[in-house]
């Protein structure tokens, strides 16, 4: 079993959580946010392509700076040559940056938000993540907690 940070290092999370240790816990809200964005951007694409271009995407998305992205408009990001040109994913990332800001106000930090979910059953956690964040479906709602060491 391998402990990892980047989701592309483990493709077993959905099939069998026992094949791969949960990812390392991020050190900041921004790292939690970046990993959520990574899961969103990767959906429907190959991990290899995303991994190969990740530094370019980081640049295009202002290093996933929550404050900067929360203030941006989708049209601004669509102009960047360094982003995946999917309007729904871009809108989702901007919305989710604003949601991370709300979570920080409500809970003090994203890890505190996740701790508040610990007493819930997995399926309830997935539903909360899908409801709270845009462009987070069932697979991402299951995969993301694994990637950030929630399990």
Q: Language-model segments: which ranges?
A:
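Short amphipathic alpha-helical surface patches that mediate protein-protein
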Residues: 55-56, 98, 118, 146-149
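N-terminal polyanion-binding entry modules of DNA glycosylases/AP lyases
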Residues: 1-84
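Phosphate-backbone recognition surface of nucleic-acid-processing proteins
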Residues: 125-134, 143-151
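Short helix-capping/linker segments at secondary-structure and domain boundaries
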Residues: 43-49, 100-108, 149-151
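Alpha-helical ds-nucleic-acid-binding substructure associated with the helix-hairpin-helix region
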Residues: 60-132
């Amino acid at each position: 079993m391998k402990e990892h940070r980047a989701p592309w290092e483990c493709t077993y999370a959905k099939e069998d959580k026992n094949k791969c240790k949960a990812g390392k816990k991020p050190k900041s809200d921004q790292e939690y946010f970046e990993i959520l964005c990574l899961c969103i951007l990767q959906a429907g694409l190959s991990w290899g392509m995303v991994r190969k271009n990740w530094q370019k995407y980081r640049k295009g998305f202002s290093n996933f700076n929550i404050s900067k992205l929360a203030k941006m408009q989708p049209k601004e990001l669509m102009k960047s040559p360094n982003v995946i040109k999917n309007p729904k994913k871009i809108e989702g990332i901007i919305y989710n940056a604003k949601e991370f800001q709300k979570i920080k106000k409500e809970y003090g930090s994203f890890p505190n938000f996740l701790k508040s979910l610990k007493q819930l059953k997995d399926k309830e956690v997935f539903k909360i993540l899908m409801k709270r964040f845009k462009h987070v479906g069932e697979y991402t709602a299951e995969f993301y907690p694994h990637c950030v060491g929630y399990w």
